[in-house]
Amino acid sequence: MRLNFERSKDSPLNILRRMGYSFLKHTPQGEMSFVKRVGYDDFPRFHVFSKMDQKGNVSLTLHLDQKGASYGGSFAHSGEYENEGVLEKEAEAIKKEFLNPKL
């Protein structure tokens, strides 16, 4: 699921951390990767890729990782990408936070 925000008042790093996300890594594509556990185990978890341009516009890609990679050396995993259920609720919470950040 893709979310776009014009001229964010705060950085994606700060906003997502306030929402309980942990920074995971920088990607080769120049994105920041964040994860947020749904329960006590490593999976399932929300996974967000974030990129901000020079004008402050933010592009997020959100999905739900159901489990880790099923074989060594692979990044492929089972995930949900559609706009429904728990993923839609998380997207709405992210939209609310990006539109009205607590500075």
Language model feature labels by segment:
Residues 1-18, 99-103:
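Terminal, regulation- and interaction-focused segments at domain boundaries
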Residues 4-6, 37, 63:
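A structural detector for beta-sheet-dominated domains
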Residues 10-47, 54:
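Ser/Thr-rich, low-complexity intrinsically disordered terminal regions
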Residues 49-103:
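C-terminal basic regulatory modules in eukaryotic proteins
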